[in-house]
């Protein structure tokens, strides 16, 4: 993670679509999607060509990863005491086409079919793997440009406009 604050994806896609007039694709976790789920109303009312792909791992995955790495797997509010609504039904209530898929072939087929049109759609991708690895990701004690897994230092220096911070 670390590419935007949790909940940022859906409103950012709305802004990008309104600004460019082009289709946007949202890739979001189930927790981040819940933070601005009401924006489905804007997508429907303005008939915006936005595809929402929810990577649904039934937990707050990025927060859970932090709990694994830094809090001795003390899962508070991420696995224990966490739930998510039926996203397919919520999208349908807003009048937006919605799908729930699982399994690699079904996921692949749905993505291909969804990208062939410009209709608004919500695709709830049900993840079954309990592992929670996100790459690249931020480390607590590193600057934003120095994500994990680490990039070769000389390569990082070539890409940076300023000298990278050494910690």
Which ranges hold each PLM region?
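Thiamine diphosphate
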Residues: 1-167
């Amino acid at each position: 993670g670390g590419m935007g604050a949790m909940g940022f994806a859906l409103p950012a896609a709305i802004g990008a679509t309104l600004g460019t007039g082009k289709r946007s694709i949202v890739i979001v976790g189930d927790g981040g999607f819940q933070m601005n789920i009401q924006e489905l109303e804007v997508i429907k009312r303005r008939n915006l060509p936005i595809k929402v792909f929810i990577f649904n791992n039934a937990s707050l995955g990025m927060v859970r990863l932090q709990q694994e790495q830094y809090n001795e797997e003390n899962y508070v509010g991420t696995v224990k005491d966490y739930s998510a609504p039926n996203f397919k039904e919520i999208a349908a209530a807003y009048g937006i086409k919605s799908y729930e898929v699982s399994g690699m072939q079904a996921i692949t087929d749905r993505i291909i079919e969804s990208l062939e049109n410009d209709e608004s759609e919500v695709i709830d991708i049900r993840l079954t793997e309990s592992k929670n690895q996100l790459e690249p990701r931020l480390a607590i004690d590193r600057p934003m440009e120095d994500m994990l897994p680490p990039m070769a230092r000389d390569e990082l220096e070539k890409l940076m406009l300023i000298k990278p911070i050494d910690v």
